[in-house]
Amino acid sequence: FGERVKKYLLHKKDYDIVIDNQSLSPGMLEIQKTYPFIEIIHHPITKDFKYDLIYSNGFMQRFFKKRWYSFLKMNKKVAPKLKKIITPSANSKKDIALDFKIDPRRIDVIPNGLDLTIFKKNNGLESERFKIVTVASADIPLKGLDTTLKAISLILDKYPNTKLSVVGNPRENGHTERVIRQLNLTNHISFKTNLSKEEVAYEYQSSSLAIISSLYEGFGFPAAEAMACGTPIISSNSSALPEIIQDFGQLYEPGNSVALRDCIENFYLNRSFYNDLAKKGSLYANETFNWEKIALDYEEQFLEIIEKFNTC
């Protein structure tokens, strides 16, 4: 990809700035010599690799995971030579600097933005009292769905009306489906797939609680989206999630299904407290993840990079 872009830009001189979204390929090093250039890194993929290895079964699966992530060697060579990097959280900045051996002074933090005309509180919609929503954008261990499923199985003895709506698509006959059968959760779990943004927002708005169970997030779109929709949040105390959620949700130890069960029960017993937090969180999300504000931050970065490039 980087080589194709490099060749293309050799013959096109009408761009003010080039922005690369985490290809981290050698061609980018050539491009930054001839154009004002910014690299966007959401988070270091070394973290995905780490958790994939932890949850791999057997030698062959680990072998193929290592083979798949072989591009990380290229990433680690290219990243330290990039002049300007933007990432969406202070936690990602720390991890990028550490894993890719980059001077943190070359990394700036600008959060991701939301479409707040879609992800917003719907005052005309009453949430379902025992409906919980979670998002698993990929059926991988990194998203921590196992923890949520086990916590739901533990809470059902006291709260049998609990239902979990999962925004995501499990692999057919894969790990997640096996766990659901083993825990006898089939009648308590529904998967929502191929949703529009409006439909995703509805899942937040119609739920009484959102659970974010990821083991690692460079930002955490589901957390920000749920906050913007005014949905109470319980989240793992992992990576960038405390930074995104601030004091507007309940945190628990990543991977601890018993702790998550206790948090869910605490929510059921103290709904008004959590709903008050959610109202404050919605205001915070609207101020912090507002694209108009974020666009101005990016514009400031673009102008600075262009000016530096033109004066060198």
Each PLM stretch: what is its role?
Residues R62-I85:
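Membrane-proximal helix-turn-helix segments that form the acceptor-binding/catalytic region
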Residues N91, G113:
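Carbohydrate-associated surface elements
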Residues L125-K143, L149-I152, S165:
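Conserved donor-binding/catalytic core segment of Leloir-type glycosyltransferases
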Residues T176-E198:
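Nucleotide-activated donor-binding/catalytic signature segment of Leloir-type glycosyltransferases, i.e.
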Residues N194, Y202-S207:
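Short alpha-helical donor nucleotide-sugar binding micro-motif in glycosyltransferases
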Residues L215:
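Aromatic "clamp/platform" in nucleotide-sugar-dependent glycosyltransferases that forms part
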Residues P232-S235:
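Short hydrophobic beta-strand element within catalytic cores of glycosyltransferases
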Residues Q250-S257, N266-R271:
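Conserved acidic donor-binding segment of nucleotide-sugar-dependent glycosyltransferases
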